[in-house]
Every structure is written in C-alpha cells, then in structure tokens.
C-alpha cells in the first residue's frame, strides 16, 4: 500500500506529561483512506489533523454504520516504540465490518497504516511511566442517502492521542455494579462488534452505577438476565476455587485482545482456565463459601483492572478484602512488561515501529 505523507507546517506544542488524561489531546497528523464501490480502498494518506466536511445526509449520522478500534503505542526505556498485537485489532476490525456490511481492510494494510502514522508522530509518544500513545482507527459510512442500506462509500481514519497512566497512583481495585435492568446486547445482535451503538446503549446504566459510587457496569445476558457477560470497557475474569473463569464468547461479548492475552498467559503460568457460563448467583454462592478469590477486568485502557467489590441487587460482594490479587498483579506486570519492553516478549506479541 502506497501512503502519501503531507506533514504539518504548524506543529502543535507537546503536552505536559503529568497531566495527559485520556482522549482529550491529539497529535499533529492523521491517516485517511477512502472506499468507493467498484474501486475499493484508495488514496491512502497521512495529513495534518483537520475537521471533516460531510454532508448532513451522510449515512453514518442516521443509521450508525460505523466501527472503531483501540490500541496503543509504547515507548520503552530502550527508546524503541512498540505496538501490542496490532494484527488482532486488524482481524477484529474485519469481524466487525462483516457484521455491519463494511468492506474488509487487508490485515497487512491496517497494520501498515497504524505503523506509518505512529512513526510520523512518534515525538508525541510520552515517556513518563505508564503513559502511552492511544491509537483510534475508525470507519464511517459517507453516502449522502437517507435510505436504509449499506453505504457504497466509506472513510477509514486513524487519530492519535497521548494518554496518561491509567493508575496514576498505582494499581487499585474498583467497584463494579452488576446491571439487571438494562441490556447491552443479545445473541445474534452486534455485541461482539466494536461499534458505537453498543457503547451508546451502555450510558444510562453507567450513569446509574456512577451515581451509586461504582466505576463501571457488569452486564448480564439479554435473554435470561442471569449470566455474566462483560464490563462496559473490559472483559471480566474470576478466580474461583483456584480456577480462572471467564464468560465464553457467545456472539454478544467483545473478543478482547487483552482477554486473549490473559487466557494464554494464565495457561502458561499453570492456572486452569475455564471459558463458560457464569451466573451472578454462582458468584454470590462462591463468595459466601470463601471460594471467590479474585476478580479482574482486562482491556486496552487499564490492561488489568482488579475488582474489589461487586454489587448485584441487594448483595454486595467484597473480594479479596478489596485488595489486589496475586493473579491480577502477575498479569499486569507481565503484560505491561512486554508492552514497554521491560521483559522479553517470548509470546511474539509486540511489533516495533521503525
């Protein structure tokens, strides 16, 4: 794939690395590529970040035909810039595209585009501990048409945002609300796809959870309303009686890149891993029996997020005395160690940006 590069003549000022936050600061450049039916993907380019000029009838505004991804670039102490399993994000992009009638992007083109735009803006990658460059690839439908049908034109873009450490004061357990009123997704729907509608549907429950002092929502299945599925921005794991248990992918759960990494590492560390149905009632009983030993989420933003408290209806479960568990800490140290080049990547997961 040939990528035309046009660099900005007015580079922005680099931000204070002690106050980056998440998703509010953007680098100088972006990647763009267009799709036209009968031609395919074309005109790949890296240009200065700019506002988009779109007709108000563009289909993305009306029927939500869009998708997005999320990954990061990390600058190690050795000065090298690494991506973490970008091929997995590329493959997941195409799985989402299949469900939403969006054309595939070749995996190698996706990875090449990510590497190219990160290379152009590599001076924006922060160096402070725990910081990274968040990468947001996304595709929107651009046909100017009010009929309900797949668009014939699309725009693929990648923007970059330097991000602060998720745990500014160190790894800490969070409280999670198990939602039993609203539903995020159902089998046969779009739960496995990374598309905006899933996140918009989560907002009401998220606001309710925040109002009650919980940081995130843990969703139940949309049919029986009793089986654990995923957290709003993470997959979920439990250590029950020595075994690592996580909900099986069933079409309504996002197949997380970090989730897959956790499963592989747990097996390598010698922990038995079960991918299966888990009911909220099973968690309550395990906690009462002293067998719910640990709970943690996994995702790109936090990597590993220990859970110290779960609330389901009138039951509040305190897990591991609201402290970080052994498995959570080992996984966090291992994955972040690989990402930042602190430990050897014997899994072959990192891709260097040169």
Question: Where are the regions a protein language model picked out?
Answer:
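Intrinsically disordered, low-complexity, positively charged segments
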Residues: 1-55, 61
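Conserved catalytic-core subdomain
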Residues: 1-18, 25, 227-354
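Extended Lys/Arg-rich, glycine-bearing segments that form polyanion-binding/interaction patches
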Residues: 16-19, 86-90, 94-212, 327
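Active-site-adjacent loop/helix segments that line or gate small-molecule/cofactor pockets in enzymes
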Residues: 24-32, 46, 59, 173-220, ...
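Short acidic-glycine loop/turn motifs at beta-strand connectors
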Residues: 34-41, 67, 74-79, 86, ...
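Conserved phosphate/anionic-ligand binding catalytic regions in large, soluble enzymes, centered on
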Residues: 55-71, 301-305
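NTP/phosphate- and nucleic-acid-binding module
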Residues: 167-175, 183-195, 199-201, 208-219, ...
């Amino acid at each position: 794939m040939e990528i035309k590069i046009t660099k900005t003549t007015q580079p922005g000022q680099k931000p204070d690395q002690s106050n980056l936050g998440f998703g509010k600061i953007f680098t100088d450049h972006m990647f763009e590529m267009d799709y036209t039916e009968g031609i395919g993907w074309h005109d790949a380019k890296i240009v200065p970040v700019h506002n988009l000029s779109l007709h108000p009838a563009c289909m993305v505004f009306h029927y939500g035909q869009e998708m997005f991804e999320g990954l990061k670039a990390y600058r190690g102490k050795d000065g090298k810039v690494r991506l973490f399993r970008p091929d997995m994000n590329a493959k997941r992009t195409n799985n989402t595209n299949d469900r939403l009638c969006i054309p595939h992007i070749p995996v190698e083109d996706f990875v090449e585009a990510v590497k190219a735009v990160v290379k152009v803006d590599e001076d924006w990658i922060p160096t402070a501990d725990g910081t990274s460059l968040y990468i947001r690839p996304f595709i929107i439908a651009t046909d100017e048409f009010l009929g309900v049908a797949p668009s014939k034109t699309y725009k693929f873009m990648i923007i970059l945002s330097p991000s602060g450490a998720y745990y500014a004061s160190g790894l800490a357990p969070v409280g999670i609300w198990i939602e039993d009123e609203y539903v995020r997704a159902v089998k046969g729907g779009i739960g496995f796809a990374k598309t905006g509608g899933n996140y918009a549907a989560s907002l009401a429950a998220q606001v309710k959870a925040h109002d009650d002092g919980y940081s995130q929502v843990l969703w139940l299945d949309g049919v029986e309303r009793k089986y654990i599925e995923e957290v709003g921005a993470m997959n979920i794991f439990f250590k029950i009686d020595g075994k690592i248990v996580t909900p099986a992918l069933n079409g309504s759960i996002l197949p997380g890149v970090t989730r897959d990494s956790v499963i592989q590492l747990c097996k390598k560390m010698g922990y038995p891993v079960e991918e299966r149905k888990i009911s909220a009632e099973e968690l309550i009983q395990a906690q009462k029996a002293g067998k719910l030993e640990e709970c943690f989420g996994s995702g790109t933003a936090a990597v590993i997020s220990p859970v110290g408290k779960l609330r389901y209806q009138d039951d509040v479960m305190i897990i591991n005395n609201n402290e970080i568990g052994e498995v959570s800490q080992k996984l966090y140290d291992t994955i972040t160690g690989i990402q930042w080049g602190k430990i050897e990547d014997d899994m072959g997961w990192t891709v260097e940006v040169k």
